[in-house]
């Protein structure tokens, strides 16, 4: 079946159907798009994946007697865990946060990737397959790599992700009203942003921050782009515009003050 083919090739196909930049990938390379509208692969993939997922009720595969540890439950860790369990490996996932998903759960807003999708994935493709999850467990503190090998794990996959924000390295970046996007998306409800917000950048992450902030009560939000066009996909840009996000172009930040951000104009030759 089409659903089985998708899942065997990519266990996270249902996630990809929702969050991948299809404009630059499958739909962007569709030959029909040269003369008209491309095939809407994302909608097709989502329908097939979600329909097939509800029928996935098989239990664990016969054990081959070998243990494998997965450190981190982001997209890489989840994919490898499912594939290894398919071949009979006894898989345990060690996750530093309270729930699985990594950047999928803590870096992508719910309006783009509903958390229920990840919860259903955990139930159908982890728990029912015999994959064990140890949440709130950081490898390197109470438990180390040597401890895992001592307890019979034959292999360890480390997929802890890249959670470090990209700093601007400009004056004022440490002020109290300045926040990094990845930190904000991790838990928006813990931030008090006020009514007017500036987002430095215009990529897909900036669109996520902007649209989330508007949903959390921000009244005026402007994204500043260094270039004449946004780096975000047209799809995300269109949604942000419809929801009230403003844009300024060819602006580069040089300093952050208590009153706001100082920008300079960027000229492109």
Model-inferred region functions:
Residues 1-60, 125-127, 133-135, 146-183:
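Glycine/serine-rich phosphate-binding loop and adjoining beta1-alpha1 elements at the start
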Residues 193-221:
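Predominantly flavin-linked oxidoreductase catalytic cores and closely associated redox partners
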Residues 11, 74-76, 99, 203-205:
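Residue-level detector of alpha-helix initiation sites
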Residues 89-105, 221-230:
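Glycine-rich FAD pyrophosphate-binding loop
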Residues 61-68, 194:
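A short, charged/proline- and glycine-enriched loop
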Residues 68-70, 91, 178, 197, ...:
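Conserved hydrophobic helix-helix packing surfaces used for dimerization/oligomerization
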Residues 66-92, 206-214:
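N-terminal Rossmann-like FAD-binding beta1-loop-alpha1 element of flavoenzymes
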Residues 116-166, 177-189, 193, 215-269:
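A Rossmann-like FAD-binding core segment of flavoenzymes
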């Amino acid at each position: 079946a089409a659903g089985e083919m998708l899942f065997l090739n990519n266990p996270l196909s249902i996630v990809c159907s929702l969050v991948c930049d299809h404009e630059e990938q499958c739909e962007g390379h569709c030959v029909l798009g040269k003369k008209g509208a491309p095939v809407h692969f994302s909608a097709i993939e989502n329908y097939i994946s979600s329909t097939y997922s509800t029928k996935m009720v098989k239990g664990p595969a016969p054990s081959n007697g070998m243990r494998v540890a997965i450190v981190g439950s982001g997209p890489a860790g989840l994919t490898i865990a499912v594939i290894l369990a398919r071949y009979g490996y006894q898989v345990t996932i060690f996750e530093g946060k309270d729930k699985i998903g990594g950047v999928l759960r803590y870096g992508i807003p719910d309006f783009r990737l509903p958390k229920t999708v990840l919860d259903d994935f955990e139930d159908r493709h982890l728990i029912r397959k015999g994959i064990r999850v140890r949440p709130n467990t950081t490898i390197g503190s109470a438990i180390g790599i040597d401890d895992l090998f001592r307890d019979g794990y034959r292999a360890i996959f480390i997929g802890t992700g890249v959670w470090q924000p990209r700093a601007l390295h400009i004056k004022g970046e440490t002020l109290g009203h300045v926040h990094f996007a990845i930190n904000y998306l991790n838990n928006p409800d813990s931030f008090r942003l006020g009514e007017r917000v500036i987002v430095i950048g215009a990529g897909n992450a900036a669109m996520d921050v902007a649209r989330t902030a508007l949903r959390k009560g921000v009244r005026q939000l402007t994204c500043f782009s260094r270039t004449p066009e946004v780096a975000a996909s047209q799809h995300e840009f269109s949604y942000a515009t419809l929801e009230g996000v403003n844009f300024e172009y060819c602006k580069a930040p040089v300093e952050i003050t208590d009153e706001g951000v100082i920008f300079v104009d960027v000229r492109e030759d």
